[in-house]
Swiss-Prot record:
NCBIfam families: rpmF_bact (TIGR01031). Belongs to the bacterial ribosomal protein bL32 family. This is Large ribosomal subunit protein bL32. GO terms for cellular component: large ribosomal subunit. The lineage of its organism: Bacteria, Pseudomonadati, Pseudomonadota, Gammaproteobacteria, Candidatus Pseudothioglobaceae. The gene is rpmF. It comes from Ruthia magnifica subsp. Calyptogena magnifica. Residues 1-19 have a biased composition (Basic residues). Keywords: Ribonucleoprotein, Ribosomal protein.
Amino acid sequence: MAVQKSRKTPSKRGMRRSHNALTNPTLSEDQETGEIHLRHHITVDGYYRGKKVIKKTQDIQEINA
């Protein structure tokens, strides 16, 4: 069974963990509606970069009725 030659220092441990920090998600505001959404995701209204890209189910039901 392998045994380490010497113990790692707290400094080395910290340097190893330096990339493990969590960051807040980046949020954007839609150009048309002003709604806040995640970057590179559509809004709840179905807008992406100021353009309507998907219809909501309510809109589809109104068309079918």
